[in-house]
Amino acid sequence: DVQLQESGPGLVKPSQSLSLTCTVTGYSITSDYAWNWIRQFPGNKLEWVGYITYSGSTNYNPSLKSRISITRDTSKNQFFLQFNSVTSEDTATYFCARSWFAYWGQGTLVTVSSAKTTPPSVYPLAP
C-alpha cells in the first residue's frame, strides 16, 4: 500500500526558512506520477503549492514560485519543500500527495510565529 508521511519543524519564526519532508513508502517516486505539496489554511481553504515529477522536473504555484523549491532524495524515497521568507500567512497544515491525489499524507501543522514555544496539542486532565 502507498503511504506518505510529512515531517517538519512545527514552529517557524517570521522571515526564516521552512523545510518539510515527505517520506513515501510502498511506491518509488522515480517510477511515475507527480509528487505534490498542498497546504490547508485555517478555515479549510486548500492551496496547491507545487510538485516534482518522477523524472525530477518541477512545477510551482505562480504566486509562490519566488519563495519555494521542491527537491528530492531518490535514495531515501523522499521529497522536500523549502519555503523561504515565511510570514504568518504561511501558517497552515502542509500535505504531500501523489497525483491524481489518490494518496495523501496526514499533514503537518506549521505555525509561523515569533513565540518561543508551541502550545501543547494535548492537555492533561486533572486527577
Spans of features found by a protein language model:
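Extracellular domains of the immunoglobulin superfamily
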Residues: D1-P127
